Amino acid sequence: MLNRRNFLTAAVGVAAAGGLAACAKKDEGASGSSSGGGSKTITLGFSQVGSESGWRTANSQSVKDAAKEAGYTLKFSDAQQKQENQISAIRSYIAQKVDVIAFSPVVVTGWDAVLKEAKAAKIPVVLTDRSVETSDESLYVTLVGSDFTDEGRRAAKILEKVLEKAGHKGAVKIAQLEGTTGAAPAIERAKGFKEVMDASHKDDWKIVVSQTGDFTRAGGKQVMAAFLQSNPDINVLFAHNDDMAIGAIQSIEAAGKKPGKDILIVSIDGVKDGFVAMSEGKINAIVECNPLLGPQLMDVVKKVKDGETVERWIKTEESDFMQDQAAAALPDRKY
């Protein structure tokens, strides 16, 4: 069972860190400044998954902006979607004796060794966006992020509305574009969607083909082209993020079909480009996954540094959007 389902609270004692060290080679750089009074600023080491999507870019910028606003020193690294890069970055942060380590894990498993090293160094770890599986739940303090399983459920439920609005009758043949293999969002979004499908639509809905598009537009385009060759009668696409859906739209149009009509599309994230596609009638519904976690993360980091008790899982607030809401919502999208 994934640890994001554990709702226990945990108190963490944090030892005072020594002087600040220079940024490691793999860090993109440090930002932030001490906020007066001679008090030592908080130093946060943050390891990001990568820059594979518009969502991730917005997430990274939110972290950087919020750290600057809070006056923290931020050591930021981009793992380029490789677990070994994240482990290396975390070890670098341990060596630099940062106050708190935060990271968005590339995959769910394989973190115990480096997390034990952080615990031994008395540096608390905060997960952002994604969960991990560990043998010891004390290896991290909290998760700040979305309920991906519920996002999958919400996607299935909003598909019910999309099908009704489209007047669809008959079998629902679904193509699923999965996120990165082994990543928490991919595992949990698929799980939540299937829960609703099996409970309410066992006889009329079927996932006829499912494959990873690695959360990228290029991946979505390539995999959707293959889907249409092997299963030309697909009438629904469930994409684990907007970028893959946008890539898939190119392949759908290249095949002479109309996205949003011949193939109904539901995706997850809510990035601005997704709303543009939805306002053009090419995506039917979007389940929001909020990337702007920076302010919440900085608040949690301060509490953890001060030894306060925090919730085991701090969820983000999110909404769902149908196609007819896109034009009105688009000007207010911040990412």
Residue map of PLM features:
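Hydrophobic alpha-helical segments within soluble ligand-binding/sensing domains
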Residues: L44, Q86, L143-V172, G219-K221, ...
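Hydrophobic alpha-helical
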Residues: F103-A120, F193, V209-V276
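Extracytoplasmic "Venus flytrap"
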Residues: T43-S62, A66, K75-S88, S92, ...
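Hinge/cleft segment of the Venus flytrap/periplasmic-binding protein
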Residues: K40-I42, L177-P185, V196, S200, ...
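Flexible loop/hinge segments that line or gate small-molecule binding clefts
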Residues: T109, A113-D150, K173, V271-A277, ...
